[in-house]
Amino acid sequence: MKNKPFWVQPLASLPLSLKPIAAIQQKHYGAVLNPTRWWGRMPRLFWLVALFVGYLERKNARLDPGLRALLMTRVSQQCECAFCIDANSLRLAQRSGAMDKVQAVAQWRDSALFSPAERVALAYAEAVTATPPVVTEAEKEALHRHFGDAQITEMTALIAFQNLSARFNAALDIPSQGLCSPKGKPHA
């Protein structure tokens, strides 16, 4: 973590109940992920949040893994969460196999890299992330042309989860960890 003074200090040492997840993060990323040091003040809630995202990211999820990463990246950008943009950009780069899509997310409306279904989902993610959420009838109809009710429900849960995560991290100024390098090569 950078030597920036935090207005809410991260934990220097994690509770015993979070040591297993810290070990997994250390092995996979080479470090304990920054948000863990803040969520660590509430280990039970941390595990509930981890279970929530774990369910949304399960192998038999209703949404394609690349679409999930795309939506999480866009919500992270809207919430201006440095850590989330970094982590979700890495996930999107890994799942799409290229950095060009990652670099085009913020300008998705002007990019040919996104499918019609991705465009509809991105518009929905932006509408749900707005405060208050404003989803138009046209957006609802467009969603139904590409996704079923179960997929839309799961998409909404994913967007809501990413809003929770990004707003928590952004409010506490949790920094990026350089997981997805700016030079076009993802780490890990």
Describe these PLM feature segments.
Residues 1-188:
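Hydrophobic alpha-helical segments
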